[in-house]
Amino acid sequence: MSTATATALTPELAAKVERLDALLAQIGERHDKVKFASSLAAEDMLLTHAILSKGVPIGIFSLNTGRLHAETLGMIDRVRERYGYEIEQFHPQQDAVDRYVAEHGLNAFYESVELRKSCCHIRKVEPLNRALADVGAWVTGQRREQSVTRAELHEEEQDEARGIAKYNPLADWTEADVWAYLKAFDVPVNPLHARGYPSIGCEPCTRAIRPGEDSRAGRWWWESRDTKECGLHITTITPIPANAEAGAAH
């Protein structure tokens, strides 16, 4: 960390950054192959910078659902330009997409939670399973503060369904922490954030949030807040005890 950058951070955030760098390095060393699932939104651009600027051996991929905003897809180019890194993209199986559209309609996800989750499974979960088929661990940019569905998030977990470790290194970071980091390190960010989109998913399923709403209120806004997950993180998860998490950063 440069002196100029260090002075731009509060002591508390500087300590979080130091711990984050140490944790990512240890994750990369601990497992033969690790991948980071990036949505190309703010938290994930933070982790992209932390990984690539330090040369941590963690691969980065994104799920190109076929229905992302142009601004989100543009972040792949910005990462290439800034870091010289090509983010790996995983796409849904076209035959599964075609069957869903033929049976239910292109935008059937508005009709019920079941049809929405089915669409998410085809466009996100199945590609994620392929992306993680050959890894020992994966990393996410999830934070506890984001929504009620993530309030119990642990920094280190065991993804029992896939038989691999799962890390959420930003679990205890606040939104203010994230944006202070992005500003201090001049990290490129999705322009949709400036238009009121703190959480960004597929274009037809994401809207800008209103004052006072939580950061994920714009995702699947027509549903109850308790159902707002796409299935990427809804698997059998075993939290790692807090003392083990603390040890992982040393």
From Swiss-Prot:
Catalytic residues of the enzyme: C230 (nucleophile)
Residues that hold [4Fe-4S] cluster according to the record: C119, C120, C202, C205
Gene3D superfamilies tied to this protein: HUPs
UniProt-listed InterPro entries: APS_reductase (IPR011798), PAPS/APS_Rdtase (IPR004511), PAPS_reduct_dom (IPR002500), Rossmann-like_a/b/a_fold (IPR014729)
Reactions that this protein is recorded to catalyse: [thioredoxin]-disulfide + sulfite + AMP + 2 H(+) = adenosine 5'-phosphosulfate + [thioredoxin]-dithiol
Cofactors, names only: [4Fe-4S] cluster
Cofactor binding note: Binds 1 [4Fe-4S] cluster per subunit.
First-listed, main subcellular location of the protein, grouped into a coarse class: cytoplasm
Cellular compartments per GO CC: cytoplasm
Pathway(s) of this molecule: Sulfur metabolism; hydrogen sulfide biosynthesis; sulfite from sulfate
EC number(s) given by UniProt: 1.8.4.10
Protein keywords: Cytoplasm, Iron, Iron-sulfur, Metal-binding, Oxidoreductase
UniProt xrefs under Pfam families: PAPS_reduct (PF01507)
Similarity comment: Belongs to the PAPS reductase family. CysH subfamily.
Function according to Swiss-Prot or TrEMBL: Catalyzes the formation of sulfite from adenosine 5'-phosphosulfate (APS) using thioredoxin as an electron donor.
Protein name in UniProt: Adenosine 5'-phosphosulfate reductase
Organism for this UniProt entry: Burkholderia cepacia (Pseudomonas cepacia)
Lineage, highest ranks first: Bacteria, Pseudomonadati, Pseudomonadota, Betaproteobacteria, Burkholderiales
Gene that specifies this protein: cysH
